[in-house]
Amino acid sequence: MKERFIKKTHYLDYQFDEPTDIKLGFTTRENGLSPYPNHSFNMARYISDSAHHITHHQDILANLIGYPRDEWVFPIQTHDSRIVEVTSEHKGTNIDELTDDLHGIDGMYTFDSHILLTMCYADCVPVYFYSEPHGYIGLAHAGWRGTYGQIVKEMLKKVDFDYEDLKIVIGPATSNSYEINDDIKNKFEELTIDSTLYIETRGKNQHGIDLKKANALLLEEAGVPSKNIYVTEYATSENLDLFFSYRVEKGQTGRMLAFIGRK
């Protein structure tokens, strides 16, 4: 399948089949001010970095994609499966500074226009949802905990229209080189999707898991047509020149920003 994320300055831009009012993308680590290492484009305020750096990077991205910072919404993610609907009243939340608002949220959606849903990632899976006929957009953060917690199915529970009208984009995340132990493997085997399709045993207490594939399987099992699910080939852990990787860089790294908005 042709890669739909096209590299631009500072971000990957998702290419739709038809003209659309939706903007969907994922930032890269290139050409910024942050020390991860020097000149990195970190987008997270919650790690050790200058607030000035983050604001500067936000301003750059805002100008590139046509969504001013006061239209952005950023929840505080906690690797859980809590979902919230956001509206125009949430615009600007946690953008200039972090607050207690939208804390513990790993999935959000809206039917309002002129809102940019944003979340930070550095190996976890960004899952974008949209339906042009229904004016709906959504974004979920699925690390191994969120994937095991089936956050994508929690997102689907909030959808009250036919899944034929729903499109899903699974963005850049770690490759199947992401290693888990027996305990985590056993957790995933509790799920009703076939674990042999996304987990590969490589040695004693060593298993590689394809989190992008697992989320696609969960969506298909829930009834989303496979033709409506796009999975990028980009892997954060395999492209350190382009992406931050929490696992590969042992936590000493920045964060990319996934975003989706509708004019």
Curated annotation (Swiss-Prot):
The keyword Cell cycle does not apply. Pfam families: Cu-oxidase_4. One of its GO terms (molecular function) is S-methyl-5-thioadenosine phosphorylase activity. The keyword Hydrolase applies. Keywords: Copper, Hydrolase, Metal-binding, Oxidoreductase, Transferase, Zinc. Its cofactor is Cu(2+); Zn(2+). It catalyses: adenosine + phosphate = alpha-D-ribose 1-phosphate + adenine; S-methyl-5'-thioadenosine + phosphate = 5-(methylsulfanyl)-alpha-D-ribose 1-phosphate + adenine; inosine + phosphate = alpha-D-ribose 1-phosphate + hypoxanthine; adenosine + H2O + H(+) = inosine + NH4(+). Zn(2+) binds at residues 79, 124, 141. Gene3D superfamilies: CNF1/YfiH-like putative cysteine hydrolases (3.60.140.10). Its EC number is 2.4.2.1, 3.5.4.4, 2.4.2.28. SUPFAM superfamilies: CNF1/YfiH-like putative cysteine hydrolases (SSF64438). NCBIfam families: peptidoglycan editing factor PgeF. Purine nucleoside enzyme that catalyzes the phosphorolysis of adenosine and inosine nucleosides, yielding D-ribose 1-phosphate and the respective free bases, adenine and hypoxanthine. Also catalyzes the phosphorolysis of S-methyl-5'-thioadenosine into adenine and S-methyl-5-thio-alpha-D-ribose 1-phosphate. Also has adenosine deaminase activity. Belongs to the purine nucleoside phosphorylase YfiH/LACC1 family. Homodimer. This is Purine nucleoside phosphorylase SE_0862. The lineage of its organism: Bacteria, Bacillati, Bacillota, Bacilli, Bacillales.
